[in-house]
C-alpha cells in the first residue's frame, strides 16, 4: 500500500515474513507487504535495529530475535539450522509488525531508515487530494445532519420542548448511527473520530429521551390539575448550547486518549524492564557456561597431571 508518511497510517500495515532462501553462506528472509516483496539478510534486520536505536537515542521496545549466544555455539547451531531459521522468521515478522503498527509511538517508523527498509513509497498527490476531499465531504455531511437534529430539538415558541422535533431528531439519529456502523466496518475513520461521533450520538439520544419524559410528566400534571415542577436534569440538558455539547464531547475524547497514552507508557516501561532482565539473564548464562568450560578444562588438566604423577611413581 502507499504509506501516508508511514507515521500517519490510518490502516494497519500487514507485514509477513513468509519465505526463506538458504544460500551457501547466509539466509534470505522474504518480507511481504501489500504491494512489495523484499528479501533481507538477518544482518540487515540487525543493522536496522541498531541504527534506529542510535538515531532515536533509546533502546527499541520491540522484541527482536537476538544473535546466537554461547549456548548456540556450544550446541553447534549453524546459521542454516532449520529450527533457528524458523525462530528468526517468526521473531522478525513480529518485530516488523510491532515497529510499523505502534499506535502510540511513531518515532521509530517515522525515521527515513525505517521507511527505506521496506521501500514505503510516498502517496500519489492526486490520490491524496481525492482522499482528503472524501474525508472533508463526509465531515461536512455529518455536521449538517447534526445541525439539523439540534434545530429539531429546539423549544417551541411557548418555551415547551418540541415532541415532534424530538421524533424527527430520533429518526435522523438512527440513520446517523447506521452510517457510523458502516464507517467502522469500512475502517474509513480514525478511532478518535469514531469515539467522538458515538459519544455525540449518545448525548443527543439522551436529549430526545429527556424531552419525551418531560412531555409525559407535563401531560400528567395537566390531567391532575397540578402544575408540574421543572425537572432539573431536563433544564440542564435544554440549557446547554451547541458549543457546550461539542466541548464536552471533545474533553471526553481527550481524557480517553490521555488514559490510553498513560497505559501505553506503563506497558512500554514494563517491556523495557523485561528486556533488561532478559539481557541480564543471558549475561549470567554466558558467565555460567564460561565457568562450566573452565571447570571442564581444569578437570581435564587434573586428570592429565594425575596420570603423569602415577607414571612417574611407577617408573621410580
UniProtKB/Swiss-Prot annotation:
Its main location: other. One of its GO terms (biological process) is intracellular protein transport. GO terms for cellular component: autophagosome membrane; endomembrane system; fungal-type vacuole membrane; phagophore assembly site; SNARE complex; vacuolar membrane. Residues 1-124 form the PX domain. Residues 168-186 form a coiled coil. Pfam families: PX (PF00787). It is found in: Vacuole. One of its GO terms (molecular function) is SNAP receptor activity. Residues 250-312 form the t-SNARE coiled-coil homology domain. Signal peptide: none annotated. The keyword Coiled coil applies. The keyword Transmembrane does not apply. Gene3D superfamilies: 1.20.5.110, Phox-like domain (3.30.1520.10). Keywords: Coiled coil, Vacuole. It comes from the Eukaryota. Present with 2360 molecules/cell in log phase SD medium. Essential for proper morphogenesis of the vacuole. May exist as structural reinforcement on the surface of the vacuolar membrane and be required for maintenance against rupture by osmotic pressure. Possibly multimeric. Associates with VAM3. This is Vacuolar morphogenesis protein 7. It comes from Saccharomyces cerevisiae (strain ATCC 204508 / S288c).
Amino acid at each position: 500500500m502507499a504509506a501516508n508518511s508511514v507515521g500517519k497510517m490510518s490502516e494497519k500495515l500487514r507485514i509477513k515474513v513468509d519465505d526463506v532462501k538458504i544460500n551457501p553462506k547466509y539466509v534470505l528472509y522474504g518480507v511481504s507487504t501489500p504491494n512489495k516483496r523484499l528479501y533481507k539478510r538477518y544482518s540487515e534486520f540487525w543493522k536496522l535495529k541498531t541504527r534506529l536505536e542510535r538515531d532515536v537515542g533509546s533502546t527499541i521496545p520491540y522484541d527482536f530475535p537476538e544473535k546466537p549466544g554461547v549456548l548456540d555455539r556450544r550446541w553447534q547451531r549453524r546459521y542454516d539450522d532449520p529450527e533457528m531459521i524458523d525462530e528468526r522468521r517468526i521473531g522478525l515478522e513480529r518485530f516488523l509488525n510491532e515497529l510499523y503498527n505502534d499506535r502510540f509511538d511513531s518515532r521509530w517508523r517515522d525515521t527515513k531508515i525505517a521507511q527505506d527498509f521496506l521501500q514505503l513509497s510516498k502517496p500519489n498527490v492526486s490520490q491524496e487530494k481525492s482522499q482528503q476531499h472524501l474525508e472533508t465531504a463526509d465531515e461536512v455531511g455529518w455536521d449538517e445532519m447534526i445541525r439539523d437534529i439540534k434545530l429539531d430539538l429546539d423549544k417551541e415558541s411557548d418555551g415547551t420542548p418540541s415532541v415532534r422535533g424530538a421524533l424527527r431528531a430520533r429518526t435522523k439519529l438512527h440513520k446517523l448511527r447506521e452510517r457510523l456502523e458502516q464507517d467502522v466496518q469500512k475502517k474509513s475513520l480514525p478511532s478518535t473520530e469514531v469515539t467522538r461521533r458515538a459519544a455525540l450520538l449518545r448525548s443527543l439520544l439522551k436529549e430526545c429521551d429527556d424531552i419525551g419524559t418531560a412531555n409525559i410528566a407535563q401531560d400528567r400534571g395537566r390531567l391532575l390539575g397540578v402544575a408540574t415542577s421543572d425537572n432539573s436534569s431536563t433544564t440542564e440538558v435544554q440549557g446547554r448550547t451547541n458549543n457546550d455539547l461539542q466541548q464536552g464531547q471533545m474533553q471526553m475524547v481527550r481524557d480517553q486518549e490521555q488514559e490510553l497514552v498513560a497505559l501505553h507508557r506503563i506497558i512500554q516501561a514494563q517491556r523495557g524492564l523485561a528486556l533488561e532482565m532478559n539481557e541480564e539473564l543471558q549475561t549470567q548464562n554466558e558467565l555460567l557456561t564460561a565457568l562450566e568450560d573452565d571447570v571442564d578444562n581444569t578437570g581435564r588438566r587434573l586428570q592429565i597431571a594425575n596420570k603423569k604423577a602415577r607414571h612417574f611413581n611407577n617408573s621410580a
